[in-house]
Curated annotation (Swiss-Prot):
Required for the formation of a threonylcarbamoyl group on adenosine at position 37 (t(6)A37) in tRNAs that read codons beginning with adenine. Is involved in the transfer of the threonylcarbamoyl moiety of threonylcarbamoyl-AMP (TC-AMP) to the N6 group of A37, together with TsaE and TsaB. TsaD likely plays a direct catalytic role in this reaction. CDD domains: ASKHA_NBD_TsaD_bac (cd24133). Substrate binds at V141, V142, S143, G144, G145, D174, G187, D191, N280. Belongs to the KAE1 / TsaD family. Fe cation binds at H119, H123, D310. One of its GO terms (biological process) is tRNA threonylcarbamoyladenosine modification. This is tRNA N6-adenosine threonylcarbamoyltransferase. Its EC number is 2.3.1.234. Transmembrane segments: none annotated. The gene is tsaD. Disulfide bonds: none annotated. It comes from Listeria monocytogenes serotype 4b (strain CLIP80459). It is found in: Cytoplasm.
Amino acid sequence: MGGLMKKNTLILGIESSCDETAASVVKNGNEIISSVVASQIESHKRFGGVVPEIASRHHVEQITLVIEEALKQANVTMDDLDGIAVTEGPGLVGALLIGVNAAKTLAFMHNLPLVGVHHIAGHIYANRFETEFKFPLLSLVVSGGHTELVLMKADNEFEIIGETRDDAAGEAYDKVARTLGLAYPGGVQIDKLAKDGEDTFHFPRAMMDEGSFDFSFSGLKSSFINTLHNLRQRGEEPNPNDMAASFQASVVDVLVSKTIRAAKQYDVKQLLLAGGVAANQGLRERLIQEVKLELPETELIIPPLALCGDNAAMIAAAGTVSFLQGKRSGFDMNANPGLLLEDI
């Protein structure tokens, strides 16, 4: 025998930061053994957005079930695990608490190491299921609560080089969708409508020419709402496909142009797309096209659709990196809705 066999690392991931209750078993940080997600979309639909109290109640109902199902699908017991990773923040405090308390209880009962994970680090590490990371790399993180350009020079080293100064892109999508009378979650509906529309309204592209890599979407959102109201006051009903296409073109132009410029400036080896809005077809297609043209030497990594939204596999992936670096969280770990990525 040529030396000892390397032991696999098996981590249980738990995610409950917003409106998905999820658990997953991941091997070596890059192989999903099981992934279970209980979504609450139907419960929040009639309110047009996530209601924190309802989200927390659903997490309480689902958390034990999803953990049991993840272990069952992976065909493992708690004794087979090396550790537990859980989303510590950011997110809704009541929702986070359910996952954190479940993780702490299991870790205590089974004498397992506990690792707190930043939700956005999870979204970034979802790309580890596609390929190994090569540094330096740049992540465009786009979700309901975050729009950031994150530079990484090593594992678990995050530098935010650009972020939104007001609304996150996903938040703007949801608000615009509500104005059009579309069902929650609005981003998916806008993306679908945009496929059959044209950019006829030419909405503003904020901060495009500034040297900064920061974003702003509040002006675009206001411009969209005002345009829609003005047309309706004149008795006109605008083409929803064109409205959606015009809005999406503005968002995608800004996101892609700043990302490409940042990737060039920092001479990155890989460019990653991460977060819920990474599922947006318009954004995915445009990024693929621009990287081919502008950054032929840079590897573009886009996660599969199943790993764009909130899930626990990504938390286990990020948690594995921290676990192997020797990082541990104590039983005094609490939900931290304001947790900063650069502080982890």
